[in-house]
């Protein structure tokens, strides 16, 4: 594999020599950093099983190598990347897989280790959504996830990925993560803090990642990480699990941050060793039981993962100073709720008791039940999924609800051909040889929902959101 020139500050190399265990070769570390990163994907098991996905893509000639710490994760090699980028394939557009670096699948694997089944989870630094969507898949779209992102520009990307993957159990917030310990004390069964860091592990993807690196900046970042971890630990219920991770390699931002928490809260903190997380995990194991993944160990990005348990309750942090404001939604119950549910079921949209109906003026939403106890304690950027807008003639069903809730075997489902599916993704109306009988049509391809549409005569009117429309080649193997 070709190498690329990575910028290494001298002080960084000195620091790595000191941090690296004697069992690892420093020359192999440098060599690994200079190799381009292997691409990897994670199959979205909310939409398709691993076996069915592998059968679906078998004719494409994609070479998939299993990632040992993630059953649904694979390194991928393709010959047609230039003609058809992976992110433009129909399987990606319909949410069947997520393009995710292999190392970044580790934190969620750790969060759910030892048969852990949390019902309310927080992803404290969630964008662009790889770990949030992985958590949702592990939860089977049940329970609830609070996905927080401090960067306003990244919240939109986070929502787009959640929507594409058909996720219904998530609430989005836009806060500095340091507020949650005070705002939502001991409210979560599990928390993932994939902390902002110096990014030393990403040089295989970005050869200039260390251009602005300095030992001083590492210490500044570690101070912020301690505050975020402190907040996360306060927001975790006693007995709950917290995973702290970074994509950096120095000890100040990794082991030292976790040891600081242990020193601060003593017996309230238990380190849960990760040596049995997957075969050969012990090759990256630290004396504390953390995983310090140097890139040459598994031929992936550099990464760090620690798993902690909260053993006892902590004194509350000072109450937050902000005002949440009035909540603009009201529960939809009784006859109204029944009417909405029956109308949705009639077009193939189904949900269970995990989701509750709420209303804001003419908008109808579905909120995860597990998140309702947080209402009034924190301001949400977006909560649950928008199901419909009501109008004089009924309901206008929303695209994100169709992707998350539609039953592809419903009587109104209409399976598109390859050519028709390409037309759909390009935003064009469909003229099938044999039009569907029903006026309300659940459009599917590869037995996955693409949207709800109206039949007008012999034409299926395209309802694909304009902002998602794609041009160019979208399918592997067709002309």
Swiss-Prot record:
GO molecular function terms listed in the Swiss-Prot or TrEMBL record: RNA binding; rRNA (cytosine-C5-)-methyltransferase activity
Residue positions of the active site: 247
GO annotations of cellular component type: cytoplasm
Localisation: Cytoplasm
Broad EC category: transferase
Keywords: Cytoplasm, Methyltransferase, RNA-binding, rRNA processing, S-adenosyl-L-methionine, Transferase
Reactions this protein catalyses: cytidine(1407) in 16S rRNA + S-adenosyl-L-methionine = 5-methylcytidine(1407) in 16S rRNA + S-adenosyl-L-homocysteine + H(+)
A Pfam family per the record: YebU_pre-PUA_dom
Family annotation (InterPro entries): Methyltr_RsmF_N, MeTrfase_RsmB-F_NOP2_cat, MeTrfase_RsmB-F_NOP2_dom, Nol1_Nop2_Fmu_2, Nop2p, RCMT, rRNA_ssu_MeTfrase_F, RsmB/NOL1/NOP2-like_CS
One BP term from GO: rRNA base methylation
E.C. no: 2.1.1.178
Binding, S-adenosyl-L-methionine: 125-131, 149, 176, 194
Keyword hit for RNA-binding: yes
Chief location of this protein within or outside the cell: cytoplasm
Function: Specifically methylates the cytosine at position 1407 (m5C1407) of 16S rRNA.
Family recorded in the similarity comment: Belongs to the class I-like SAM-binding methyltransferase superfamily. RsmB/NOP family.
Name under which the protein is recorded: Ribosomal RNA small subunit methyltransferase F
Native source organism of the sequence: Salmonella typhimurium (strain LT2 / SGSC1412 / ATCC 700720)
Upper lineage: Bacteria, Pseudomonadati, Pseudomonadota, Gammaproteobacteria, Enterobacterales
Gene: rsmF
